Amino acid sequence: MGGIVELDLHGKNAYQARVAIDAALRRAGGGVYRIRVIHGYHGGTALRDMVRREYAGRVTRLDTGVDPGVTDLVLREF
């Protein structure tokens, strides 16, 4: 894996999303500097809120960008 890894959480509940994100963080090698979490927002903000709350302290920073359905977990600055 290298660069940016995209993780689509559509259709997952909070537990499944957490498991998927944790697995992506474990698999992220030295070449991965960002995990783009696609959680959506039209169906509600539960996944977005969980991602931002639970992973803010575990990564270098969160990048929320202009798309409210995406949160980037920045592992290291590029």
Regions found by a protein language model. Give the residues of each.
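Long, charged, low-complexity intrinsically disordered regions
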Residues: 1-78
